[in-house]
Amino acid sequence: MHKVELFIPCFIDQLYPETAFNTIKLLEKAGCDVIYNTEQTCCGQPAYNAGFWDDAKSIGQKFLNDFTEEHPIVSPSASCTGMVREGYDDLFTNTTDHNRCRGIQRNIFEISDFLVNVMKKEYFGAELVGRAVYHDS
């Protein structure tokens, strides 16, 4: 079984909790053992986007402490994954957290990226009858 750490962003936690539960179901169906740290909160993107970089950095430091480099970190949010992969460069480059940040950045995946490119899964027996939207972050 493939162990993964699950990051549920603050907006999903508060507004779309079913998405969190469905993410767990999907990862388990793909053969993952899901680890969920109940102390996690946010990636810091709302503060970062609003220009409050000191606050975003504090939240980001908590994020770096809440997750490990031992297992892939999987999130159902492309924008939060993008924040960690790209935005954290603005917050942590040339700091004492720089190396740890780089390790986390290499280890975080949006769920579809993880399933297709890491787990090599492309079919789950489901079919969508309707429209879908793709958000490239």
Model-derived features with residue positions:
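Iron-sulfur cluster-binding electron-transfer modules in prokaryotic oxidoreductases
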Residues: 1-137
